[in-house]
Amino acid sequence: MSIRENIASNIITVMSAVTSPITLKKVTREPFDVDELSEQQYPAIFIQSGNEQRTDETMTSTSVTRQGVADFIIVGFVKGSGTNIDTKRNELISTIETALESDRTRGGYAKITQIVEVSTDEGTLFPIGGIRVVVRVMYTYTAGTP
């Protein structure tokens, strides 16, 4: 597997193991139709590999070391009532951030992991709440093995 794929797999593994402050009921890399989720599948997230920037770091006569800065997009959904949907969205965001901060090297595959953007549906999906978290990961690899 490539380092980028190993990082994506690490994010799935970490998110699947979360139990506090909330337990994620559905964690996948495949987008899903939120209207098809049962009550028992909330909160649910999917993770997608996003854009990446690559630059050469070092070159020798036999290899090139590159740095990749890749974005991974986490899209999540919670379900609540009129009095707690914003709280549930915030709990989901906090859960994701806490889990990712537990190992910013993504199992040794990355130099650093940062959450660079958080956005919400701002109530447009009520009674479902949606969030989007952009996770930026910096890593190095040998050219030909991203």
What is each of the regions a protein language model found here?
Residues 1-42, 46-146:
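Charged, amphipathic alpha-helical segments and their flanking helix caps
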